[in-house]
Design a protein with these regions (language model features):
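Conserved catalytic-loop position in the HRD/HxD motif
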Residues: 164, 169
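Conserved alphaE helix
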Residues: 145-156
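C-lobe/activation-segment region of protein kinase-like
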Residues: 141, 182-236
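Conserved ATP-binding subdomain of kinase catalytic cores across diverse folds
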Residues: 18-125, 158, 162
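AlphaC helix of the protein kinase catalytic domain
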Residues: 124-139
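Broad phosphate/nucleotide-binding scaffolds in NTP-utilizing and phosphate-metabolizing enzymes
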Residues: 1-16, 23, 96
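Short, glycine/acidic-enriched loop or turn micro-motifs at the edges of active sites
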Residues: 120, 172, 189-191
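Hydrophobic residue at the +6 position relative to the catalytic HRD Asp in the kinase catalytic loop
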Residues: 170-177
Length: 236
């Protein structure tokens, strides 16, 4: 078992923190979001955190839900995401602060978890798009997606790209909006790469496809105008 954290927290980290049941029994489990990687919002003594357990997706999930082939500690998913988030914090870019990662080896395989800071936010970019374009969607609420956010999102992505931060799944669900702030989350499989127009454009194109999927519109004049505002922010 390996725990990755800052030297300041090393003596304080309890392996039980990586177990959902621990927080349930403490009455400190605040919520859950179960996608491919299940995450739980928890209330620690130091504030709100997010606990993430890494699950497989696609075909391999049918064979093995959460075990990965062991290729060394530094190649484990949680280790790499922790280190990337730590570097992003050093660059002062808007993302969750990593708290600790747990990697447990079982023979030829391992499972892993990550604890990170909870980002206070009003809505995701995806929720804002739904609120605007899908009036009959049951998950729609009254929060409005201000035009300023499109420009800010473009600027924020540009800051990441300028520093060579590659996001493997840049989509509208992984962008959080809070008043005048834009945060990007979920850096699993992310990396630091030499800035390159090819992967950067692929990132932008992936986000555009996500926006079209969430809004259920691909040839809409208003959406096209808003997308141009995002690109203007990106190219400032």
């Amino acid at each position: 078992m390996s725990i990755i954290t800052s030297p300041k927290l090393k003596s304080d980290i309890d392996p039980q923190w990586f177990e959902q049941d621990y927080w349930v029994n403490q009455g400190r489990l605040l919520g859950a979001n179960c996608g491919r990687g299940s995450t739980w919002t928890i209330k620690s003594e130091w504030g709100k955190w997010v606990l993430r357990h890494y699950f497989r997706g696609g075909f391999y999930a049918k064979l093995n839900r959460d075990r990965y082939f062991w290729l060394g500690l530094k190649n484990s998913r949680a280790y790499k995401e922790y280190q990337l988030l730590d570097e992003i914090q050093r660059l002062n870019l808007p993302s969750p602060k990593p708290i600790a990662a747990l990697i447990v080896k079982h023979g030829l395989f391992y499972r892993n978890d990550l604890i990170m800071e909870h980002i206070q936010h009003q809505m995701t970019f995806a929720q804002g798009i739904k609120n605007q374009y899908l009036p009959n969607d049951p998950s729609r609420d009254k929060k409005q997606l201000d035009l300023k956010y499109w420009h800010q999102i473009g600027q924020t992505i540009a800051q990441y790209h300028h520093n060579g931060i590659y996001h493997s799944d840049l989509n509208a669900h992984n962008v959080l909006l809070n008043h005048d702030q834009v945060f990007i989350i979920d850096f699993d499989k992310g990396a630091i790469k030499p800035p390159n127009q090819h992967w950067q454009q692929n990132n932008i194109s992936r986000l555009k496809r996500s926006i079209e999927k969430v809004s259920q519109k691909s040839c809409d004049d208003q959406l096209s105008e808003q997308w141009q505002i995002l690109l203007e922010g990106y190219h400032v």
